[in-house]
């Protein structure tokens, strides 16, 4: 028994002991861990770690080349919140140009420290707040960082090879920041348009801006080696632009910043992200293992990827401004405002979203009866229109009877002839009376005037309007007056088909009225002529 060991209390204090236990394991005491196969969780974790950065295999797959030394231009749209770029510059030794327009970069330090040979860098609309880390690009000659939130230009003083600098639409508001660019001896082209420094030399209220402030002349003094300023020769220091125009231009620059494809830094993690690459349109809520890598790589001379630019950056939102807050002040009755907004939304609806008539719809077929040419009033207009056009007489405006039921559809609505088309198709009547020609036959020498119907239509208040009957009577009187001018004109105007159609139209058929109708009047041609009908006016001397 070990003297330094007490079974009840464990090892005693102030005593040391060594216990050796013999193992019954016959194999190695420290065996190597065994793998469960290619689809194990460990392998998936390893693949995920490889996808976290731009590995050589990943770059080769994107560039579609086996030798990465052939890649001279790399264009990517990245989001460094999802994954690190790693030290990818080590695998691209001949990379000269790097395009990251529309990406989301927290800092330039995310690019790594292996791009010392890079000469051209595009960083437009990347959400950059500063240029910290740009000192790791000593060979940089051209920097395009427009539409960001850069206000500090001090890191640029370390770029001795810099020749072109584009800072359009940023937040430079102090001429003291422009002074740092004096340390760039080769700087020849500078763009500061869209910055607050164009309106005032220092931050502060606009009412304290020195009178006659000309920022072009001030920048020219600070950077004497400058040749081009805002795409205009730096030697041209003309009068400054009106303040109002410059402020409007600044508003346009801010709108361009907000139109970036990627959300700003303060975007919530659960919100979906719209990327410029169609392969990257997955929401952030998905797992990282199922997300594709947000890169698109181009070799010089290769085609641009499809869908590089977003088509719909700001879709229209029909929700109320009160939902998102920061809306206009609501004054007056809120119910009235909601009704007006509903009308505006309905007015903006495209025609394809409105309900359309379907031929097979049972509801529409039951509510709209089939038209019948025999008992429809439009048959009058279609039957007599040819006779009106042949003789060049302009008819009276055609009116449909008003429907008594609210919301009812006229049975002959689709076949209605517009008055404008009738007037355009008909030749104009001459102002002078037409010449009266002799009748070709004996029967046509007699001027026929229709007699009133023997069985007048019964008065029915629920079937038609009194205005319709008055209209027919006025047409009949007009035909009789025109017919009294002479046999020649009467033969054309008061033709038998037209008068017969007027006589039939003066009463409605049983199907139109919903009740048994009167018997039709005998034909005018079969009826023996009366004495009044055989008389015709005296001929007009020619």
UniProtKB/Swiss-Prot annotation:
Annotated localization: Cell projection, Cilium
Gene Ontology process terms (BP): cell projection organization
Basic and acidic residues biased stretches: 416-426
Repeat (LRR) residue spans along the chain: 94-115, 117-138, 139-160, 161-182, 186-206
Residue span(s) of domain LRRCT: 207-250
Oligomeric and partner information: Interacts with IFT88.
Family, as annotated: Belongs to the LRRC56 family.
Reported disease: Ciliary dyskinesia, primary, 39: A form of primary ciliary dyskinesia, a disorder characterized by abnormalities of motile cilia. Respiratory infections leading to chronic inflammation and bronchiectasis are recurrent, due to defects in the respiratory cilia. Some patients exhibit randomization of left-right body asymmetry and situs inversus. Primary ciliary dyskinesia associated with situs inversus is referred to as Kartagener syndrome. CILD39 inheritance is autosomal recessive.
Protein name: Leucine-rich repeat-containing protein 56
